[in-house]
């Protein structure tokens, strides 16, 4: 029987420190509906793993309000015309399907996620018609006189009036996800002349993701995940990504509850401002100044690696390519670097150090440190 009381130690995973959000070309700099997110570095393969999971959650998991039914004075069914209104009821229904409403069903709110009936009285007299050239467009904003819903497209025309009239319009709004046909929507208190609509709840219009190569130090075997998200404005792309992440976390937590050993991960070496000088002092040390076996020292010397800086910038696979450099030497070097709180494949770019200039930079930093000590 396995002992589940002890944690398992796993090697570190390279993870992004943050997710960058950028505007999309052609969106006018707006991130209300279009945004691109970049996460790097990720371990090889994790770009596609996360990208596909997030894409599916974004497309099927998010909720938003939508109109699920409407009724109107004088309207008996969907297949009729209304005197004094240009559009027939079928076209009014189509226009209502294009209405975009925004509201967050907060946990502590009085209404929560319950469907709400929004009633509005539309009164149009002769002077209103005259001011509009004989035709007065009734927009989505005109129909949202109560309920606390915000119109994403307030100028969206629902119907057009050509003669003075007073009509009451009632819209039933519900929260949901995905797409529901009118046949699937069940209203417990449905009115006699209430017309049920198909409802598009999902606020996400399009999601694409791309995976590119990126580097950590000199190692290019990592993924960069680029995620493009377009919404209809009922939620922003940033909100959509945050909500979908929480949805995935909720589902993954089911599998985390299995009674098995827990994993803890080794932490990656982080070069912070407060220990930058301390790390530099270690990087300029000569290979012969640390306690390595003669075999390992000779292997590094034959590879023309003279300083710790030249060593730690090397990715592990690169070291194994050197002549006579085997797993035993690699293990010894990794353990020694770990004692020094360093590791192979470190990113030294903040010191201006790359694989092409590391030898010159280490000499320059060593001289700078010596000069500073002399002055001190």
Swiss-Prot record:
Q: Identify the stretch annotated as signal peptide in this record.
A: none
Q: Which family does it belong to?
A: Belongs to the RNA polymerase alpha chain family.
The Enzyme Commission number assigned here is 2.7.7.6
- What Pfam families does the record point to? RNA_pol_A_bac, RNA_pol_A_CTD, RNA_pol_L
Q: Its encoding gene is what?
A: rpoA
Q: Which SUPFAM superfamilies match?
A: C-terminal domain of RNA polymerase alpha subunit, Insert subdomain of RNA polymerase alpha subunit, RBP11-like subunits of RNA polymerase
Q: What is this protein called?
A: DNA-directed RNA polymerase subunit alpha
**Taxonomically, which superkingdom?**
Bacteria
What terms describe the molecular function in GO for this protein?
A: DNA binding; DNA-directed RNA polymerase activity; protein dimerization activity
Q: What does this protein do?
A: DNA-dependent RNA polymerase catalyzes the transcription of DNA into RNA using the four ribonucleoside triphosphates as substrates.
Q: Where is this region: Alpha C-terminal domain (alpha-CTD)?
A: 276-376
Specify where the region named Alpha N-terminal domain (alpha-NTD) lies, as residue ranges: 1-259
Please state what the annotation says regarding this protein's domains. The N-terminal domain is essential for RNAP assembly and basal transcription, whereas the C-terminal domain is involved in interaction with transcriptional regulators and with upstream promoter elements.
Picking any one GO biological process from the record gives: DNA-templated transcription
Q: From which residue to which does any coiled coil extend?
A: none
InterPro entries referenced in this protein's UniProt entry, alphabetically: DNA-dir_RNA_pol_insert, DNA-dir_RNA_pol_RpoA/D/Rpb3, DNA-dir_RpoA, RBP11-like, RNAP_asu_C, RNApol_insert_sf
Q: Which UniProt keywords apply?
A: DNA-directed RNA polymerase, Nucleotidyltransferase, Transcription, Transferase
């Amino acid at each position: 029987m396995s002992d589940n009381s002890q944690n398992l130690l796993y090697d570190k995973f390279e993870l992004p420190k943050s997710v960058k959000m950028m505007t999309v070309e052609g969106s006018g700099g707006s991130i209300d509906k279009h945004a691109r997110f970049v996460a790097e570095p990720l371990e090889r393969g994790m770009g596609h793993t996360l990208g596909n999971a997030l894409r599916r959650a974004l497309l099927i998991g998010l909720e938003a309000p939508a109109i699920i039914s409407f009724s109107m004075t004088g309207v008996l069914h969907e297949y009729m015309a209304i005197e004094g209104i240009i559009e027939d009821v079928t076209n009014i229904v189509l226009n209502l399907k294009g209405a975009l409403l925004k509201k967050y069903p907060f946990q502590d709110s009085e209404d929560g996620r319950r469907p709400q009936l929004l009633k509005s009285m539309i009164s149009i007299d002769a002077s209103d018609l005259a001011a509009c050239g004989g035709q007065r467009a009734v927009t989505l904003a005109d129909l949202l006189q109560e309920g606390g819903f915000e119109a994403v497209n307030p100028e969206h025309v629902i119907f057009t009036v050509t003669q003075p009239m007073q009509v009451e319009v009632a819209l039933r709004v519900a929260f949901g996800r995905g797409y529901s046909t009118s046949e699937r929507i069940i209203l417990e208190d449905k009115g006699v002349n209430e017309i049920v609509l198909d409802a598009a709840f999902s606020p996400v219009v399009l999601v694409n993701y791309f995976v590119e190569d990126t580097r950590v130090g000199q190692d290019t075997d990592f993924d960069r995940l680029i995620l493009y998200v377009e919404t209809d404005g009922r939620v922003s792309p940033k909100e959509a990504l945050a909500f979908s992440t929480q949805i995935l976390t909720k589902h993954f937590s089911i599998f985390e509850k299995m009674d098995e050993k827990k994993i803890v991960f080794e932490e990656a070496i982080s070069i912070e401002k407060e220990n930058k000088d301390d790390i530099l002092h270690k990087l300029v040390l000569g290979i012969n100044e640390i306690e390595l076996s003669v075999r390992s020292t000779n292997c590094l010397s034959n590879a023309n690696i003279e300083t710790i800086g030249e060593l730690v910038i090397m990715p592990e696979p690169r070291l194994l390519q050197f002549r006579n450099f085997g797993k035993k030497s690699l293990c010894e070097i990794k353990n020694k670097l770990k004692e020094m709180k360093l590791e192979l494949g470190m990113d030294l770019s903040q010191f201006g150090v790359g694989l092409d200039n590391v030898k010159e930079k280490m000499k320059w930093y060593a001289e700078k440190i010596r000069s500073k000590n002399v002055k001190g």
